[in-house]
Structures are given as structure tokens and as C-alpha cells.
Amino acid sequence: GAFCLSEPEAGSDATSQRQKAIDYWDHYLLNGTKNWITNGSTASTYLVIAQTDADKGHNGINVFILEKGMPGFEISVKEDKLGIRGSDTHTLVFNDVKIPKENRVGDNGFGFKFAMKTLAGGRIGIAAQALGIAAGAYDLSLAYSKERETFGKTINKHQAIQFKLADMYVDIENARNLVYKSAWHKDQKMDYNLSGAVAKLHASEVAMRTTIEAVQIHGGYGYVKEYHVERLMRDAKITQIYEGTSEIQRIVIARN
């Protein structure tokens, strides 16, 4: 399946939805565009967030179930991304898509609450992704530092590299604890809005710092595709952006 929230003019500000679903008694008529949709072409079922009443603000947003092949539903451009290139990311276009009334999820106006809840849980997953990227970059860097020699000794014997590895390790351990804490909150059915935002912010920042240092430790080899750290650095960047940017996480943390 695919979760369809972001639009060309509605990213961090999810309330500024331009996608409209007009109520025609026994059905809705959907028009608009969605961007950055993961599983855009491979999904068979889509949860689409759309505005039904602009005057009601976030209370005028609903979520609808759509299926691939519905008349007027077009899978458009596949994004040529910096990282996570194996992820199927597309633009979706909706031109007068007729949606049965029973395809609306929940009560009228439920869409915004649904979207925010989905993002809050998704942030824990992105934090775990970032943690995995950072840990992978650290493991590769540690192994490389034990093999690569300069000035008559392996580079892990140089204090400059030791300090980099030590900082990477501390960052990763902190991120791991925050990720596990937020996941535990969710498992225990506790409020995880704050802990999820903290975990995602810290883990994504750690992933970016760690992968940059991993490339530096590898030197020239870190810059070529023969070694995996350049890919990890490209993959790390998106964790600071999707499911809410680092700046949005700071807003969530401050408000909680």
C-alpha cells in the first residue's frame, strides 16, 4: 500500500492541502496531485489525504481508500533521487476520480488526525532506519581502519581516527537508546509523539554525521561506489527530511 499526504505546495504544512474531494451525494470527486509517494507504482491500495471543506481548516480534511486502475488515477513521474534509490517514489495525479462514499475512512474530518498519527508512528521507523545506516557506516569504518595503513601503522592507531570512531560510537549508542525507548512507548500504548520526534531528530542527525565521517575515514575510497559508505551517506540525508524534517521535529519537541 501507499500513504499519500505530500503535495507540491503542502509538505511540512500538511493543513495546506490543495487536493480536493468534492462531495456529490453518493460519491466524492477527487482532483489534485500527490508528490514523493513511496510505493507509488507498486502499491495496489492507496490511502489519500484530501481537503473536503477548506473553511474548516484541518477539520475539513479526510482520508480515502483508492485502488490502482480507478478511472482518472494516473501514476506519473518516478523521482530520480539522491539516495534510497531502490525505493519506488512517484508523483500521483488524480483527475475527476470517482470515489464511493464508503471509501472514506472514519468520521467526516478524520483525515488530519489520521495523517498526524501515521507520521508520529512512522518517525520511529525512520529513526530505526537512520540508526541502521549509522551503525552500518560505523562498522565499515572500523573494519577499514584496521586494514588501511599510513605512516607505517594502521589508521586506527592514529588519534585523529580514534577520536572519530569514538564519537561515532557514542552517537550511535545514544541514538539506539532513544529509538528503543520510543518503540517501547508505542508497544506499551503510551504517548509516543514526543519520544518519536526526539528519536527521529537525533538518529537522523547521527546518521548524517556518521556517514560523513565514514567517507572521511575511507578517504578517496569513500568517494567511489566500490565502497558502500558513499551510498550510506546519500541514504542518510532523507532521514532528516521525510516523515517530518529535523526542523519540524524540533517544533514538535518544543510544543510537547
Segments (PLM) and residue ranges:
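A short, Trp-centered hydrophobic/proline-enriched beta-strand micro-motif
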Residues: 1-5
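Short Gly/Pro-enriched turn/cap motifs at secondary-structure boundaries
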Residues: 9-12, 36-39, 53-55, 81-88
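Alpha-helical interface subdomain recognition
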Residues: 11-16, 23-28, 91-93, 110-256
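Short, solvent-exposed loop/turn segments at the edges of secondary structure
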Residues: 14-16, 42-43, 58-59, 87-89, ...
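Flexible, small-/acidic-enriched active-site or ligand-binding loops
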Residues: 16-17, 71-100
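Short beta-strand-to-turn element immediately C-terminal to the catalytic PLP-Schiff-base lysine
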Residues: 22, 48-52, 65-67, 93-95, ...
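A short core secondary-structure module
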Residues: 31-75
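Short, charged, solvent-exposed linker or helix-capping segments at domain edges/interfaces
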Residues: 60, 75-77, 100-108
